[in-house]
Amino acid sequence: MAAETDTTLPELRETVASLPTGPGIYQFKNSAGKVIYVGKAKNIRSRVRSYFRDPRQLTGKTQVLVGHITDLEIIITSSEVEALILENNLIKELKPRYNVNLKDDKTYPWLVITGEPFPRVFISRNRTRDKSTWFGPYTEAGQLRSILELIGSIFPVRSCRYSLTPENIAAKKHKLCLDYHIGKCKGPCEGLQNEAEYLEMIGEIVRLLKGRTAGLLKELHEKMLTAAAELRFEEAAELKMQLQSLRRYADRQKMVAADGMDRDVSAIASGDDEACGVVFRIREGKMLGARHFILTNTAGEPEKKLLGKVLEGYYLKSPEAMPEEVLLSAQLDLEDTESLQALSREREEECPTRRKAVKFTVPQIGEKAHLVEMCRQNARHHLAEYLVQKQKRGEAAREHYGVKALGESLHLETPPKRIECFDNSHLQGTDYVSSMVCFVNGKPLKSAYRKFRLQSLEEACGTGSSDDYAAMEQVLGRRYGGSLQDELPLPDLIVVDGGKGQANSAKKVLDRLGITVPVIGLAKRLEEVFTPDADGPFNLPKTSPALKLLQQLRDEAHRFAITYHRNIRSKRTLETGLTTIPGVGEKIAFALLERFGSVDGVAAASAEELSQFAGKVKGMSIFRHYHP
């Protein structure tokens, strides 16, 4: 298990870095491709990244889970609620190993309007196929109860279980209950409200549950303001709660369709020569999963042709019958439509309960259009992820080839996987620094970068001369003979910026320390490669991957050295010019330089100018420093 984790986690961390930051669900898979865990997230990237932090911060069960992860897949949603619904559906469908006993596998509740003459409205978790109208499912039972209470407070709908047939009402079989006496029911049980009036009220409730809430929101808001103005604060507070509940309901999740239909949704995202198609699988109004397909060599292909290829590939491999409806991002070609209808007719023999032809539609507005757009959003994500991985594979191949080519060009026994490169920087013998950069498998390993500071060339060389060779010896001695020899592993190749003299200086240090690491020098002007044992340089072809890798190393070492040198020089300038003044720190010194242009500009400023900029006390201190 440990070996599997060590090889898998770096690849997964790269995948995690490209994940979106919006809501959705993620599925972890094992080496057999089986989903072993499904989770939801407000921020997919942040949540998934948390699994790959320091194992000591994870629970024992999570560590075991992470040890089995070899791949992951996500589905983007429009809201956290949609992610919650989808997570519940997928856990029920897939029964992932590591979700067992971790999730409450209850069935989400529905709101039911019965098909009786005087319909009742209530909550149920067990959906049945009868004449009732079902709304939901809802993710929060508490919110659903609030909606039911809201309906009861606005509409006098009956709560009793009486069988209100015309015969029972005429026979006065049922008596008025408490709800009638407190104004929550109009008494249809005794014929005090007719069926037509009652059904009209039920129609209003249905419109409310379908999201037509604007008028009701306005009415409740006006009632709340009136109650507050008349000092009926308790009633106003209750109306405010009803208003908040209704607003939450108006924003109910869109992933689950109230009609409970079986349908698939498919959309395409296209690049220059690649495309991605996604298929959402929705059953009984609930989305149970998604699949994506990468298509190559797609330049010039219309979206409808790509959709046809995706759907044919999907349904040919799908073991179940096609759904009643397929929502699309573009209209299919007639030929593709006919072939899919033919495939559907074949599958009907295995599913004789459904005889309707499949309906292929391209919705323009409403919830169906929302589902298509969400599907396209997922397609865009998968395509972007594919293109990033493709680019990384290409870069990795080039980097690997560069390392291999360099090893062959230098006649090394093995490719130099770890390379360290040194560069010196100074200004007329002052602020002398050296940098070391490290590349592993052709890529910078910045955690292994090091910088060295020498106070002067005299110290670097041990003499009064300006001997860059001796300076290089000093730096290499500190890297391979000092404390760093235990901190960092030895490289497979050492590169120094310079010609044969620098290469020989480096070799002298390594011989003295008993280190047998190959060393070369790379001269800037002609890009010549020098080795200590050769009489002269040799040149690599200008297009050689080996030369490109050496140039990248040398340029990175030079950049690192120059940056360090500039920082030291800037700090020294501040220390010698401004930070020696009492009360002037680095922050104020930089601000003064920005305001007056230079140290000379600060010295030439008047007491009034300095006081206005730095304050009276500090301003006068700076002025007296230059004008004692």
From Swiss-Prot:
Question: Keyword set for this entry?
Answer: Cytoplasm, DNA damage, DNA excision, DNA repair, Excision nuclease, SOS response
**Which residues are in the UVR domain?**
214-249
Q: Which Pfam families match?
A: GIY-YIG, HHH_5, UVR, UvrC_RNaseH, UvrC_RNaseH_dom
The family database entries (SMART domains) matched by this protein are listed as: GIYc
Judging by the UniProt lineage, the source's domain of life is Bacteria
Q: What is its main location?
A: cytoplasm
InterPro entries annotated for this entry? GIY-YIG_endonuc (IPR000305), GIY-YIG_endonuc_sf (IPR035901), GIY-YIG_UvrC_Cho (IPR047296), RuvA_2-like (IPR010994), UVR_dom (IPR001943), UVR_dom_sf (IPR036876), UvrABC_protein_C (IPR050066), UvrC (IPR004791)
Its cellular-component GO annotations read:
cytoplasm; excinuclease repair complex
Compartments where located:
Cytoplasm
- GO MF annotations for this entry? DNA binding; excinuclease ABC activity
Q: Residues in domain GIY-YIG? A: 21-100
A biological process term (GO) from this entry = SOS response
- Which HAMAP family does this chain map to? UvrC
Purpose: The UvrABC repair system catalyzes the recognition and processing of DNA lesions. UvrC both incises the 5' and 3' sides of the lesion. The N-terminal half is responsible for the 3' incision and the C-terminal half is responsible for the 5' incision.
NCBIfam families the UniProt entry points to: PRK00558.1-5, uvrC
The protein's assembly and partners: Interacts with UvrB in an incision complex.
Q: Which family does it belong to?
A: Belongs to the UvrC family.
- Name it: UvrABC system protein C
Say which species the protein is native to.
Chlorobium luteolum (strain DSM 273 / BCRC 81028 / 2530)
Taxonomy-wise, where does this protein's organism fall, top ranks first?
Bacteria, Pseudomonadati, Chlorobiota, Chlorobiia, Chlorobiales
Per the record, the gene is uvrC
